[in-house]
């Protein structure tokens, strides 16, 4: 991996391309990210670049993290993430990673925490079928069978049941970068990206490029 950046989700809109085709896009405020540490094989056992994103007040930073930022002589940041760049040696502390690291036509993977839906039933959470809707039916949205009776006499692990839905780390692969606004550090990505507005999104060059 050579390209990655942290961003916040602004929302969705739609744009027309050169052929007049309407395309739904997600607007991402990407960077600028500041390099807070460069890790090397000699010192850390692997090559990586640690970046900070989104300014934060000093009183909201604990002492160990504050010392880390002070050592790097960079502003305090809300998020710290690490990317295993193949070209990590090309970066230095205080360098900035901006939206221009990507270009229109690039394929990226977007990772974020999905929207939380709370406690949901098996129909909404897992797409299970509902029961008969006739007047004499014993249930409509209740779950069906959970397994056999005496044998095995238990519910198997992994059985789909009602429970908490959402708030999971989701990655959408092979999204196309439609447009990059270098001046405002904005990236437009084709399609939807997980998470609510203002949530943190990690953009990386895709690991499964379309053939």
From Swiss-Prot:
Task: Tell me where the signal peptide lies.
Answer: none
Name the segments for region: Disordered: 130-154
* Cellular component annotations (GO), alphabetically ordered: cytosolic large ribosomal subunit
Q: Which SUPFAM superfamilies match?
A: Translation proteins
Instruction: Quote the Pfam families the UniProt record gives.
Output: Ribosomal_L3 (PF00297)
Task: Indicate whether Repeat appears among the record's keywords.
Answer: no
Name the Gene Ontology molecular function terms of this record. Answer: rRNA binding; structural constituent of ribosome
Keywords tagged on the record = Ribonucleoprotein, Ribosomal protein, RNA-binding, rRNA-binding
By its UniProt entry, which InterPro entries does this protein fall under? Ribosomal_uL3, Ribosomal_uL3_bac/org-type, Ribosomal_uL3_CS, Transl_B-barrel_sf
Highest taxon in the source lineage:
Bacteria
> What GO biological process term is on the record, naming one?
translation
Q: Family per UniProt? A: Belongs to the universal ribosomal protein uL3 family.
Q: What does this protein do?
A: One of the primary rRNA binding proteins, it binds directly near the 3'-end of the 23S rRNA, where it nucleates assembly of the 50S subunit.
Q: How does it assemble?
A: Part of the 50S ribosomal subunit. Forms a cluster with proteins L14 and L19.
Q: What is this protein called?
A: Large ribosomal subunit protein uL3
Species: Lachnospira eligens (strain ATCC 27750 / DSM 3376 / VPI C15-48 / C15-B4)
């Amino acid at each position: 991996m050579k390209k990655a950046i942290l961003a916040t989700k602004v929302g969705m809109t739609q744009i027309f391309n050169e052929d007049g085709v309407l395309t739904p896009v997600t607007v991402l405020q990407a960077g600028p990210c500041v390099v807070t540490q460069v890790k090397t094989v000699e010192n850390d056992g692997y090559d990586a670049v640690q970046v900070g994103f989104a300014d934060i007040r000093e009183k909201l930073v604990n002492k160990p993290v504050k010392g880390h930022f002070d050592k790097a002589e960079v502003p305090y940041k809300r998020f710290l993430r690490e990317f295993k760049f193949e070209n990590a040696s090309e970066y230095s502390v205080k360098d900035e990673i901006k939206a221009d690291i990507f270009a229109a036509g690039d394929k990226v993977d977007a990772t974020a925490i999905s929207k939380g839906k709370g406690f949901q039933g098996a129909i909404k959470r897992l797409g299970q079928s509902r029961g008969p809707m006739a007047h004499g039916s014993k249930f409509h949205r209740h779950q069906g069978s959970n397994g056999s009776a005496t044998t095995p006499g238990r519910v198997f692990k992994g059985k789909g049941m009602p429970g908490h839905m959402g708030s999971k780390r989701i990655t959408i692969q092979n999204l196309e970068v439609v447009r990059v606004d270098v001046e405002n550090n904005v990236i437009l990505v084709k399609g939807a990206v997980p998470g609510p507005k203002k949530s943190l999104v990690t953009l990386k060059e895709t690991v499964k490029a379309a053939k």
